[in-house]
Swiss-Prot record:
Residues 450-509 form the SH3 domain. GO terms for cellular component: cytoplasm; plasma membrane; ruffle membrane. Residues 149-171, 184-239, 374-451 are annotated as: Disordered. Changing residue 8 to T: In HYPT5; uncertain significance. It is found in: Cytoplasm. This is Epidermal growth factor receptor kinase substrate 8-like protein 3. GO terms for molecular function: actin binding; guanyl-nucleotide exchange factor activity. Gene3D superfamilies: Pleckstrin-homology domain (PH domain)/Phosphotyrosine-binding domain (PTB), SH3 Domains, Transcription Factor, Ets-1. GO terms for biological process: positive regulation of ruffle assembly; regulation of hair cycle; regulation of Rho protein signal transduction; Rho protein signal transduction. Residues 386-401 have a biased composition (Polar residues). It comes from Homo sapiens.
């Protein structure tokens, strides 16, 4: 038999390699299944409790293990018999909620715990495996990669149909390039008057962004806790804000991509990179704030969007967030961005639709990203008011919110302290003269000066355009015009603007604050603040003693206009958090740095 030619060998090798690469990834390893723990019992509340249970059983010699094959195929995590290859159990890859590794903790030295949602059953279970051959760390990494590939390779289809299971079928979509997406444009289908049609038109992105369409039903509207605000909801305005927020995020990503390319060219030609392509720390902070603000907007719009769902946009934002974090020059900068805190609706939305890798990314950002306003135990963050690169401003707020989209406070109009008509009798109109012969007409005489109407803020409100006014809970305001649902008010700093009337309550005579006392529970920073007031503000914000000593000698004007580079030199450890706080104060006061 003659030896095959070199060309024949090459062609056979080429065909062999092409066949291998065209086949779906098949992960298959031999493991030892130790036990499965149902979570939610009195002793097992999470993966750590399951491991502790294993340690106890191992010490007592009660572990009944079984060797088997752990395999990933066609989007399923399968447990197979070693000899017959019979399927013993299986779970959807996207039902995996967490994976943890425990090394050298007992007689089993390489344990992988996988927490999954049981198919068709409520609650979760934790499976424990001894990974002697492959190693728990390596197997965890392989499973995470398989899960990411599975999420990316789903066919791009429409949203979930009624009755369609969230995790089965083609509901999850493959990554959608940003150049194929469009921005929101309001449009109400006639057959569904309370649903919105959402379209996107985003500029080209350096990376494709994933899409996802599953979401759970939103919870019923409830009155927010007294210490936090629930901004009156107007979906059309929220859509407009979201449009511009997403556009600014994309613009920042484009700048980041250009900066990265510039850095690569400098490295190629041996030049030193002295900057980040013109991107400042404040720009990174602004982008992180806008991403958080987007989550809050999507939480409010979750039941309003139709064709493009809120979870789809959440996945787009997380892809963008991952892209930005990978290129951020300061690793912990995002975790220090506190304002704006997420709303409970935003938290619920993220919990309902994030994939395991996205959930890990989210949790890794810390409490400032994972704690809702209602559960935040730190210092009260200052209100967040976004500014836009194109100087776009919102139109005047509408007088009524659409049906099905009323704000939580307005749903409680039965309370006598809420509502625009329950505070005091409405004034009579004076837009005409008395009619001749009217027995009630009397010669006009100067009217005594009416005392200024004082109100107290029940819930904080963030201004969304120059016509509105940012207020905080407990602030005392003077009402200038209360003829409409949105009232014109003036704060003690002399700034005036519109706020919704249903976040106010009457200020009774003799209430502290009626004589010009400070309306805030914490010291306020203003341009006119003296050094001792700046010191009080820094201490109230829980900055370190060194920071208070360094910056406490400045006036409010000096601190609010300090440059990021100067602040970095003076307070290198806390500069990011100080910048974030100062930016929030600037927005509230309506000043530029």
């Amino acid at each position: 038999m003659s030896r095959p030619s070199s060309r024949a060998i090459y062609l056979h090798r080429k065909e062999y390699s092409q066949n291998l690469t065209s086949e779906p990834t098949l992960l298959q390893h031999r493991v030892e299944h130790l036990m499965t723990c149902k979570q939610g019992s009195q002793r097992v509340q999470g993966p750590e409790d399951a491991l502790q249970k294993l340690f106890e059983m191992d010490a007592q010699g009660r572990v009944w293990s079984q060797d088997l094959i752990l395999q990933v195929r066609d989007g399923w995590l399968q447990l197979l018999d070693i000899e017959t290859k019979e399927e013993l159990d299986s779970y959807r890859l996207d039902s995996i909620q967490a994976m943890n590794v425990a090394l050298n903790t007992c007689s089993y030295n390489s344990i992988l715990s996988i927490t999954v949602q049981e198919p068709g059953l409520p609650g979760t279970s934790t499976l424990l495996f001894q990974c002697q051959e492959v190693g728990a760390e390596r197997l965890k990494t392989s499973l995470q990669k398989a899960l990411e590939e599975e999420l990316e390779q789903r066919p791009r289809l429409g949203g979930l149909q009624p009755g369609q299971d969230r995790w089965r079928g083609p509901a999850m979509e493959r990554p959608l390039p940003m150049e194929q997406a469009r921005y929101l444009e309001p449009g109400i289908p006639p057959e569904q008057p309370h649903q919105r049609t959402l379209e996107h038109s985003l500029p080209p992105s350096p990376r494709p962004l994933p899409r996802h369409t599953s979401a759970r039903e939103p919870s019923a509207f409830t009155l927010p806790p007294p210490r936090r605000s629930s901004s009156p909801e107007d979906p059309e305005r929220d859509e407009e804000v979201l449009n511009h927020v997403l556009r600014d995020i994309e613009l920042f990503m484009g700048k980041l991509e250009k900066a990265q390319a510039k850095t690569s060219r400098k490295k190629k030609f041996g030049k030193k990179n002295k900057d980040q392509g013109g991107l400042t720390q404040a720009q990174y902070i602004d982008c992180f704030q806008k991403i958080k603000h987007s989550f809050n907007l999507l939480g409010r719009l979750a039941t309003w969007l139709k064709e493009t769902s809120a979870p789809e946009l959440v996945h787009i934002l997380f892809k963008s967030l991952n892209f930005i974090l990978a290129r951020c020059p300061e690793a912990g900068l995002a975790a220090q961005v506190i304002s704006p805190l997420l709303t409970p609706k935003a938290i619920n939305l993220l919990q309902s639709c994030l994939s395991p890798p996205e959930s890990n990314l989210w949790m890794g950002l810390g409490p400032a990203w994972t704690t809702s306003r209602a559960d935040w135990t730190g210092d009260e963050p200052l209100p967040y008011q976004p500014t836009f690169s194109d100087d776009w401003q919102l139109p005047e707020p509408s007088s009524q919110a659409p049906l099905g989209y009323q704000d939580p406070v307005s749903l409680r109009r039965g309370s006598h302290r809420l509502g625009s008509t329950s505070h005091f009798p409405q004034e009579k109109t004076h837009n005409h003269d008395p009619q001749p012969g009217d027995p009630n007409s009397r010669p006009s005489s100067p009217k005594p000066a009416q005392p200024a109407l004082k109100m107290q803020v029940l819930y904080e409100f963030e201004a969304r355009n120059p016509r509105e006014l940012t207020v905080v809970q407990g602030e005392k305001l003077e009402v200038l015009d209360h003829s409409k649902r949105w009232w014109l008010v003036k704060n003690e700093a002399g700034r005036s603007g519109y706020i919704p009337s249903n976040i106010l309550e009457p200020l009774q005579p003799g209430t502290p604050g009626t004589q010009g006392q400070s309306p805030s529970r914490v010291p306020m920073l203003r341009l006119s603040s003296r050094p001792e007031e700046v010191t009080d503000w820094l201490q109230a914000e829980n900055f370190s003693t060194a920071t208070v000593r360094t910056l406490g000698s400045l006036t409010g004007s000096q601190l609010l206009r300090i440059r990021p580079g100067e602040l970095q030199m003076l307070c290198p450890q806390e500069a990011p958090r100080i910048l974030s706080r100062l930016e929030a104060v600037r927005r509230m006061l309506g000043i530029s740095p």
